[in-house]
Amino acid sequence: MKMKKKRKDKKLSLKKIISMSAVTAVLCTSTLTPASITTETSTAKTLSTKEITATENPVTTKEPVTTKKPASTKKPTSAKKPTNTKKPTAAKKKKSNITKITISAAGDCTLGSDYKSPSSVNFYAKYNEKKNASYFFKNVKKIFKNDDLTLVNFEGTLTKRNTRAQKTFAFKGNPSYLKILQKGNVDAVSFANNHCRDYGEGSYQDTISVFKKNKMSYASYGKVSVYKTKGKKIGMIAVNGLEGVSSSEYYIKKGIQKLKKKKVNLIIVSMHAGIEKTSSINDVQKSIAHYAVQHGANLVLGHHPHTLQGIEKYKGAYIVYSLANFCFGGNTNPADKDTMIFQQTFTFKNKKLKKTKDVKIIPCKVSSSNSINNYQPTPAKGAAKKRIISKMNSFCKPYNLSFNKNGKLK
């Protein structure tokens, strides 16, 4: 019995040994097979590439962030605060901040007549014939509409008084005639001359009341005027040089002081001075005009001679010594019908007035008819235009100024 058991035990242990050897052999083979190494490496690569991919995605997304930090760092966009800093755009906006003010000036306007003038052809007759206030400035109203300020000399009175002054010529018109200026796009008047009291002191006050009632800007002796356009203030002073140089200088000095307190951007002085029916400029005109510029006037406009005179550039400002007649009811048929509209464009850059010579003249006739005064100022054409420009060039020659064939200052 014991022997059988031993044999059985031997058989069992042999089986164990054999199976263990087989297991060992299998284990050894499977561990050291090159195929199994490759698979593990692939898995490792797969894992590591996923890990890389996983880590690369953050890097990539962060790199947009980091590259977006160049984008933020590329604060060229913020650094496109060069765009703001590159305030050439802001500087270019300052260019669009340039303001141009065009002023048109014309001469003596008498809306009415002397009662001694021929009743069939005087101003009253023409007004009654046309029954239309737009008739008188019809041919120049577009010019005046396209500027920023139109200024004329108002010579006469708007009154119903009959207390005529003892003088050779005395002018008055119906107060309703003011609408002639309004329909013609006239914005302001100077009112300091030898005809503003033709029907007594009362007629002067009546006329001013008409201006005020109709909101017409006016300057007269000590009364200055401020006209606002395009965010700029234009100050106006009017003096009567026929009453003496010292009187004019007084009003100019006081007027400029008042206007400077009002912080105006431009100052225009209108002076009524000179000798009638001559192209010669006298010392009174020069003295008053130069004084005005020396004290701060940017432009001086003259009238009274009833004929054109030269233009001078003095210390950077233009002086127009005489603008002649314009819509002039004071003469039914003047021998000299030549006149003009003077225009100057002032340029402001960053609120500062630039030095420019943007000046032109528009040759005109006081009438659209050559044979009579029909009180309808009209731009000259063809030979008449050429002749008036040539005339002005001869008047301006002493001051070294001249105009081209279109009336533009050379």
Language model features with spans:
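Generic short N-terminal amphipathic or hydrophobic helices
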Residues: K16-I17, S36-T38, E51
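Acidic, metal/ion-coordinating pockets
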Residues: A91-K410
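Ser/Thr/Gly/Pro-rich low-complexity, disordered linker/stalk segments of secreted
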Residues: L47, E51-K95
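N-terminal Lys/Arg-rich, disordered targeting/topogenic segments
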Residues: M1-S13
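Acidic, serine/threonine-rich low-complexity intrinsically disordered regions
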Residues: M1-M3, T41-T43, T66
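Sec-dependent N-terminal signal peptides
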Residues: L12-S30
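Sec-dependent signal peptide cleavage junction
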Residues: T29-L47
